[in-house]
């Protein structure tokens, strides 16, 4: 194995074990190390090994290199005694790691050569890696992009989450119905994660609280008679881009405090003997267990506290390595809460400071509020997390006491600001009096943090003026905006290498770490030769997606058609149903008037619905049934194709995004916090049809209004329509025979083999005057805008020009910019 011993100079307090192996990264050394891992780690004969074996061995080889750099990075952290960031997220949707690591290490050509010497192609090898099932949607993918930028900007930080054994679920489509299967991403193990024998932390649940006096006579709470679960750390390494800086995500796995209860086993009760083990380890099995019943809700709460409690024991362990006052805690520790899932961390830190460290309330609260910052990710009131007082008191009795005390002291502040205003106190309270009584986790996160940020300018303004208006009045300096971004390393350099090469050849490589340099593409939009090459690359990407579609669905699509794409979580507010209505309208138009003047389209959907979200699953069914009718109607003659790709994930997105011509970002204005899919599509040269929602507004500002297809109401207009409707869905139908025909065709069973009841719930929701997502009120505008899209696509040269200008305007939407703002404006850490 090609390893050199690198002697590391010893600093005071270091020992003789401080030498770190140095791994050569030339092609011959990489090849030798691949062979070593085939033999030593897998027991495989190199001459009989297949692509999956090579993939695993290459992954271990890359991990060896990363570990070396990670150890050096950690030494730098400790030597400089810098403040560290702890990013707490229930999701990290990182996708595949192999190609990303090869690119960020800057050894692509050497790895290609090493793999070629073994008779394989690197791209083919990378296809054998499983996506890490550690997240679901935008929340987790944002966290993953953040980790990439944190490493690239050399910020001392760690990501903390859960190592899910099965992730969310593997989505299969059976007769158009979503079927959830286990996502067994770890069935062959993972080359990228490694278990740590230490530190292992106990996490407490249930029990009750007693009290005793300390030596000074002060009240001290004791949480006793608990059920304990052990948290085992598992690390996954994240490299920065060509900077030798590697950080880690620490993911926790739940294990029983006792593997086997021998008393049960001895009595022949074999199920009882392992019952505790099974119950404990369920905590880290699945992301977002269904919460439609009390057992599911309890498991979700236990998941959230499990990873928070283990994380804070780890933070305390690191903080205490050298004796120091807890007054220094906020100077050494910054904790970012990614949504409300980890908000239970606020009472947990208070518990540690009060009960374990013996601090007084005022001191502990001052330390805690200076430590935490909270990112809000939703404008949907129903998505603002709440736990019943009964459940939280059962699972975490001490934390409920602390939350009540936080609330009591907070409401005293409110009373000073709004004296004798009981209604205002009720509105502010962390405790919703119900019934049932509930803990408002967003309120807890706001009260317990020094910073609350939205993730787009519109989102933040709506938080200040609508969702948390009173909190903004009480804490005017606490709310701020940090528009989301994406990492260009993953979403252009890796996923679209041909386009990345074209860009680098013409404007240099600086854009990879300074995305603002894409502005230098603007003059090239008027260069005919550049546009032609751009189109050729787009066509090649579309051929790749067409091949993928055929392999996974059996549907043949033409790369010459417009690839009109909507891929994201299936939810009513994201309005996949609106897209479906346009499909039916377009289908009717082709049947009546032929295809003259209509740009051929392939409309691609992908995304998962929550297992218990039956209406979202019904939308999937309708889209699949529309496809079944349209794709098999000879009168359409291939001018319109509908595809629903199953099991959407990061790797699938890396194929879809570069191939898209049109990006559907059509949520009801005022419902999407930001979105990042919109950014990924634009960065890959897709034009957007969208509403003035989330980051769409800022994308439109950056790429130019003339290069964005806008439709629909604004957030203000949408809110006005909900409060004082100017028209009803039925009136929309009465004024448009075309729209009436679309709705009637669904209602009469045209897409359900004559079954008029199957999609009746969707028809009823469309015609409901109280439809909060306002599909029918935006439909006319959407159909008209789609006509403009079709006409624009026919002029291929101008479409390409618009696509180039979209890419040129994407500089703002790098997570490098986002993380720099977090670091300097929230965490108080200057970026070099």
Show the residue positions of the predicted features:
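A conserved ligand/cofactor-binding region detector
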Residues: 2-832
């Amino acid at each position: 194995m090609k390893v050199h011993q690198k002697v590391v100079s010893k600093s005071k307090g270091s020992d003789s074990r401080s030498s770190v192996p140095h791994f050569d990264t030339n092609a011959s050394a990489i090849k030798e190390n691949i062979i070593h891992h085939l033999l030593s780690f897998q027991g495989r004969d190199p001459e009989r090994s297949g692509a999956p074996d090579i993939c695993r061995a290459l992954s271990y080889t890359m991990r060896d290199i990363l570990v070396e750099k990670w150890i050096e990075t950690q030494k730098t952290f400790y030597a400089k005694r810098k403040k560290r960031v702890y990013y707490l997220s229930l999701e990290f949707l990182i996708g595949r790691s192999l190609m990303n690591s090869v690119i960020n290490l800057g050894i692509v050509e050497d790895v290609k050569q090493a793999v070629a010497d073994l008779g394989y192609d690197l791209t083919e090898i990378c296809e054998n890696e499983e996506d890490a099932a550690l997240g679901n949607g935008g929340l987790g993918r944002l966290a993953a992009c953040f980790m990439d930028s944190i490493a690239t900007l050399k910020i001392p930080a760690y990501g903390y989450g859960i190592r899910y054994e099965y992730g969310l679920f593997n989505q299969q489509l059976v007769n158009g119905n979503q079927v959830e299967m286990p996502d067994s991403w770890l069935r062959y193990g993972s080359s990228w994660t490694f278990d740590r024998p230490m530190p292992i932390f106990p996490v407490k649940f249930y029990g009750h609280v007693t009290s005793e006096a300390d030596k000074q006579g002060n009240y001290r709470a004791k949480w006793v008679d608990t059920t304990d679960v052990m948290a085992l750390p598992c690390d996954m390494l994240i490299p920065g881009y060509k900077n030798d800086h590697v950080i880690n995500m620490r993911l926790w796995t739940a294990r029983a405090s006792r593997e086997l209860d021998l008393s049960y086993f001895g009595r022949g009760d074999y199920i009882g003997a392992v019952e505790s083990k099974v119950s404990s380890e369920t905590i880290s099995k699945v992301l977002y267990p269904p919460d439609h019943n009390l057992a599911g809700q309890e498991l979700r709460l236990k998941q959230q506290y499990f990873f928070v409690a283990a994380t804070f024991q780890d933070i305390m362990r690191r903080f205490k390595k050298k004796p120091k006052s807890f007054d220094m805690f906020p100077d050494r520790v910054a904790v970012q809460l990614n949504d409300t899932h980890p908000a239970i961390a606020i009472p947990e830190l208070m518990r540690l400071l009060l009960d374990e460290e013996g601090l007084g309330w005022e001191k502990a609260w001052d330390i805690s509020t200076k430590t935490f910052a909270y990112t809000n990710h939703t404008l949907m009131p129903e998505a603002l997390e709440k736990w019943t007082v009964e459940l939280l008191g059962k699972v975490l009795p001490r934390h409920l006491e602390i939350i009540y005390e936080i609330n009591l002291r907070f409401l005293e502040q409110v009373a000073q600001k709004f004296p004798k205003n009981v209604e205002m106190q009720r509105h502010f309270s962390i405790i919703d009096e119900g019934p049932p009584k509930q803990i408002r986790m967003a309120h807890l996160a706001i009260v317990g943090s020094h910073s609350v940020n939205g993730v787009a300018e519109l989102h933040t303004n709506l938080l200040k003026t609508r969702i948390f208006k009173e909190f903004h009045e009480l804490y005017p300096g606490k709310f701020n905006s940090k528009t989301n971004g994406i990492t260009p390393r993953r979403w252009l350099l890796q996923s679209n290498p041909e386009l990345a090469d074209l860009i680098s050849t013409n404007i240099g490589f600086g854009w990879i770490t300074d995305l603002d340099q894409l502005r230098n593409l603007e003059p090239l939009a008027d260069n005919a030769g550049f546009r032609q090459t751009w189109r050729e690359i787009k066509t090649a990407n579309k051929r790749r997606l067409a091949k993928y579609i055929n392999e996974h669905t059996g549907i043949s699509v033409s790369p010459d058609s417009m690839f009109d794409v909507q891929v994201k979580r299936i939810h009513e507010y994201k309005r996949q149903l609106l897209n479906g209505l346009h499909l039916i309208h377009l289908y009717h138009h082709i049947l009546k008037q032929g295809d003259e003047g209509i740009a051929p389209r392939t409309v691609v959907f992908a995304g998962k619905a929550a297992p218990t979200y039956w209406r979202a699953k019904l939308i999937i069914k309708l889209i699949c049934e529309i496809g079944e009718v349209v794709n098999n109607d000879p009168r359409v003659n291939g001018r319109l194709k509908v595809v629903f790709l199953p099991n959407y994930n990061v790797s699938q997105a890396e194929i879809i995004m570069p191939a898209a011509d049109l990006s559907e970002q059509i949520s009801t204005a005022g419902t999407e916090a930001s979105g990042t899919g919109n950014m990924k599509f634009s960065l890959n040269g897709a034009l957007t049809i969208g509403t003035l929602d989330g980051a769409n507004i800022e994308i439109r500002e950056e790429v130019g209004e003339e290069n964005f297809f806008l439709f629909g109401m604004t957030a203000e207009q949408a809110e006005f329509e909900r409060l004082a409707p100017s028209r009803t869905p039925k009136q929309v139908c009465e004024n448009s025979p075309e729209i009436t025909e679309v709705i009637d065709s669904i209602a009469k069973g045209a897409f359900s083999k004559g079954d008029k009841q199957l999609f009746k719930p969707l028809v009823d929701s469309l015609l409901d005057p109280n439809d909060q997502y306002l599909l029918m009120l935006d439909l006319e505008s959407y159909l008209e805008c789609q006509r403009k899209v079709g006409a624009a696509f026919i002029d291929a040269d101008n479409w390409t020009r618009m696509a180039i200008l979209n890419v040129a305007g994407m500089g703002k939407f790098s997570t490098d910019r986002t993380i720099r703002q977090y670091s300097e404006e929230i965490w108080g850490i200057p970026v070099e």
